[in-house]
Every structure is written in C-alpha cells, then in structure tokens.
C-alpha cells in the first residue's frame, strides 16, 4: 500500500538560533503532526487505498522530455556549511562591522555621498541592517532637497539617484522635480544635458522605471535615457569598464525590476571591481553572503527531504524534479533572516505547482483532468477512488500539505485558513483545465481571452495566499476566499509573471504541446511578425509595471500586509530575471546564478 504523507518531515522548522537580530518573527512551525494529538485525529495524513495499487492499463501519453535535476537529493543533503563555531565567530565579526557602518551612515558628508552609500548598501543586500539609519538620512535629504517640486539643485545625477531611492522608501516625490532638465518648450529632456554625463543618464534611466500611471515626464525620461545608453554601448564609447558593465546589466533589466538577493554574487563582484569600494562594507558583504548561504543550504535540505519523502518524483517520472529551482524562486520573494518559514512554504508550493502543472500540461487525459479538478473542488478523501493511481498520489500530497500548513497556522495564530488555501488551488486547477480543453479542441483564443485564464493558471494565487496568511499580523483570513479577482496587486503581479514566462518559454511549450501563448495569440489577432509580437509583450510588461507602481503607492486599500504585498510584487521581479535567459527550469545561465548563490561561498 502506497502512502503519500509529508508529515514525516518537519519542513517548517526554523533552523536559525542565536542572536535576536536573526530570530524568526514566527515561532518554530513544523509540518510534523503528533500522532497521538487530537489534531492528528482531525487532520489525518491520507493514504492511498490498497485497492488502487493496480495501475491503469498503459496508454499513449505526452512527454515533456524534461532533463533530470542537476542537483539530486544526495548532493543537496551533503551540503555542509553550517559549523557552529565558525558561525559564532562570523556573527561576532558581523556585529562589529555593522556598528562601524552605522558610524559611516551617521557621518556628516555631502548629500550625494550619503545617497551613494545607501545605494551601495541596498545593491549589496545590506540595507536591512540599517533601516532606521537609512530612513533618517533619506528624511533629511527629502526635507532639504525634494519636498518642494521646484528643483533648486540642478544636478541630474543627484536628482535622479535621490528620486529613485526616495520612491523606493515610500516618499512622495513628484516627477516635476525633473522639469528643470527639459528643453525650453518643456516637451522633452534637454539632449545636451542627457548626452554629456553617462553616469547621470544611467541614474535617470533607473529612476524612470518608478513611473506610475499618467507620469509622462518619467516616460520621456525612460525613452531618451534608453536611447542614449544603448547608443553608448553600441559605439563602445564608455571608457570605464565597470560603468559599461553596469549599463549593459541595467539595459537588460533595470534595478526596479530586479531582486538583489537572486543576483547577490553579481552585485558583490561588481563592487569588488570598484577602486572606490569601502573595505568595511566589502568585508561585511562577503561575511553576510556566507552566513545567509549557510542558512539557505539548511532550508534547501529541509525542502529536499520533504520532496524526497513524498516520492512523487519517483512514482510520477513525468513531473519535473526541480527542488533547487523552486527554492530559488522562494528566495526571490522573501529575503532576510526573518522569513525562513515563508521561503520553505513557498518552495514547497512551487514544487507542487510544477508537478500539478505537468499533470495538466503533459500527462493527464482530458477525462482524467476533469475528474481531478472535481476532486480538488470537493476537497475530500472519499472521492479519490475514481482517480487513476498517479492522480491519487498527486492529490493526497497536495491535500496533506495544505492540511498540515493550515494546522500549524491554526496552532500558532488561532485562525482557520483552509477555506483560503483550498480556494487558491481551486482557482488555479480550473484555469489549468480550461487550457487543457483549449488544447484538446485546438481552440486558439484571442490575447484578451487567453490572458483572462493564463493570468490565473500561472499560479500566483496559491503562491501568495499561504505566505500572506502565515504572517503574524495579517488579517487576510477575515476576507472572503472568493474575492481574489478583486485584488489589483495579485492580478498585476500575475500578469508580469505570465508575460515574462511567455517570452521565455512560449516557443518551447508550443512545440512540445501546449496552448498558444501571448506571443502566438497576438500574432493571430494582428498578423504581426514574431518579433513585433514579442516587442508588444515587452511593452505590455512595462504598462503593467506602471499599474503596479501606482497600486503600491496607493496601498492603503491593499488587503495584504506590507510583507505580503512585496512578496506578490517580487514574483514579477523574479520572473523577469529568471526568464531573461530562458525557461527558468532549463539549461540556461540561470543555473550558474543558482550555483553561485547556494553552493559557492565568498572567500
């Protein structure tokens, strides 16, 4: 008799101990239910009935032709970067360096130097150590230079850098601060100002991606700065190699669309190459990188043990085995030492989404998928006998995971989250089923119709909801689980993820058997060329980001906590980076980033 239960593995334990600065905001949650407790009788791990051991007759099935994981279970479990005496020594030195850097932030220096220091700390992933100090410095700079819409400084570099950092930290800075850099007619930026200072043009480019709906000045800034920077790169006229490298990096994706932690090694190496680097900050960056890497390895090992014990990769060989990739996404959503629980929850959800997506996209017949969807709607264990063996395994893994997670939240927060967790999966699999029906019938939807379903099937709802309800101060459980479509931040982050995914994976997925993606739908609607269609999808991503920026600036009505909202937005950021080089699960350069982040310490 086959048993699918994740209760044997304490996935949600927090491995961090020691100083309060590194203590989790959550209590130590474990997925392991005590067998003798009343809770274990209420939410029992489900087992596949013995009468289902006979597997169905063989039939022709599609195959995703997925390659095996680059990092198997044994490799992940062999990671050993967590020596207590070494960590104690590292933490002590880290605390000393933090004190010294705080003194740097408190030193009276030029405002532009203060901004550059803060920008370095953010890019190097250190700003969470200095939140109060950074807020104090930025408040002073805002009051002295940016509160008045009439820019009295006249320095494009300072204005653009300050504008970006202030908007990142929630200050209300008007786009009119850039009006003094426009031509006499005020219709565009003064090209003589833009062309003469490459560093200032780069800062204007980065600032322009914080534009909101209706901010035409920032739209102009984005257009003209992009044109000039691309021209400089094409001509090879940038003599500073470090600056040239940074510009190429930014033209691929601006800072506002990136997640620092996913590229921590790139930013560290870029800082190391600078002649003006601060040795204290450089040492702290390397030290913190190694401490975080040790924590990430422990979390990754826990997630890997849970996945291995589920045995889905063994029993369902058609599903992708992508533990490291799924954890990489989780690191993008929640950075910092306080959110290990959320990272592990998200990694497990990503793994389940990947497996269930393969059931719908690759292996299941349409009749089986309809049965599977109906069982998930019912959310019981009495209906599973009608499912084929492989679907029983998949369903019970999902059912047990959701039940265990809900139990732990109930135990810790005293709230029942099953209705929200369950409905998040119902929404997703119903969208999966609609796409399967389209594929089976050969139906080609319009772009609008496609996105109405594909923005749900991309899986943002079951990603964000468990993260949000696990946050201690969240009140989301008081809302109806049937209102997810009303939340702009969920919808917009899903659109960025879907469109970025389609740019990275569309051709491969259509070739292996899937519904037309955004690119193909636009071609069908407009008779555009493929390059024109891809350019339109890139334009759509930019427009969605305007709406996202607006929604985050007007977050008083947001149903999510600040942490939950940022996690939702970070889904889009992670997607744009991960799909920049390919499909996010395949052979592309993204794997090198994972290697550098998780397996290679800084020396």
From Swiss-Prot:
Mn(2+) 1 binds at residues 357, 361. It is found in: Plastid, Chloroplast. It catalyses: (2E)-geranyl diphosphate + H2O = sabinene hydrate + diphosphate. GO terms for molecular function: magnesium ion binding; protein homodimerization activity; sabinene-hydrate synthase activity; terpene synthase activity. A motif (DDXXD motif) lies at residues 357-361. Pathway: Secondary metabolite biosynthesis; terpenoid biosynthesis. Mn(2+) 3 binds at residues 501, 509. Residues 1-47 form a transit peptide. It is an enzyme of class 4 (lyase). Mn(2+) 2 binds at residues 357, 361. Homodimer. Belongs to the terpene synthase family. Its cofactor is Mn(2+); Mg(2+). Keywords: Chloroplast, Lyase, Magnesium, Manganese, Metal-binding, Plastid, Transit peptide. One of its GO terms (biological process) is diterpenoid biosynthetic process. This is Sabinene hydrate synthase, chloroplastic. The record marks 350 as: Confers reaction mechanism stereospecificity. InterPro entries: Isoprenoid_synthase_dom_sf (IPR008949), Terpene_cyclase-like_1_C (IPR034741), Terpene_cyclase_plant_C1 (IPR044814), Terpene_synth_N (IPR001906), Terpene_synth_N_sf (IPR036965), Terpene_synthase-like (IPR050148), Terpene_synthase_metal-bd (IPR005630), Terpenoid_cyclase/PrenylTrfase (IPR008930). The Asp-Asp-Xaa-Xaa-Asp/Glu (DDXXD/E) motif is important for the catalytic activity, presumably through binding to Mg(2+).
